[in-house]
Amino acid sequence: MVKINGESLEIAGRTIAQYLATTSYDIRRIAIECNGEIVPKAVYETTILQDGDIVEVVSF
């Protein structure tokens, strides 16, 4: 399970980009933190979410 904004989801093994494709977030207007670290947009395609990750998505 991956916890995103407090909600547990069965998305371990997917990339951040794959997760975002299932949402209505505007990728140009978000910031993502994974386990306390800001994730650069340049690595959304290659960052694989792992079981136990805690992710915060902030839109602005």
Can you describe what each PLM-predicted range is?
Residues 1-60:
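Ubiquitin-like/PB1-type beta-grasp interaction modules and other compact soluble beta-rich domains
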